[in-house]
């Protein structure tokens, strides 16, 4: 059996009025976003099941670096590990 790697996991995010993350929850702990390093968008597979995501690579108040994305169709947030 093949197990997918780096499957996105749902994550709780608080965004500002522009849609940029300002807080994320890792487990039960809230972390403040200190800096957004990179932002990019992926729009794909419109002919099947549309994918529209905005990704953020960011530094958090505990020193960790995480990548999250917002599904622009559903509005949900997920963490993507690399």
Label the model's feature ranges.
Residues 1-82:
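Non-catalytic peripheral regions of nucleotide-handling enzymes
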């Amino acid at each position: 059996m093949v197990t997918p790697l780096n499957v996105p996991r749902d994550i709780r995010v608080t965004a500002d009025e522009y849609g940029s993350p300002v807080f994320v929850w890792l487990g039960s702990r809230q972390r403040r976003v200190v800096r957004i390093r990179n932002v990019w968008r992926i729009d794909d597979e419109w002919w099947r099941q549309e994918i529209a995501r905005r990704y953020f690579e960011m530094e958090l108040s505990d020193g960790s670096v995480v990548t999250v994305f917002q599904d622009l169709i559903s509005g949900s947030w997920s963490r993507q590990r690399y």
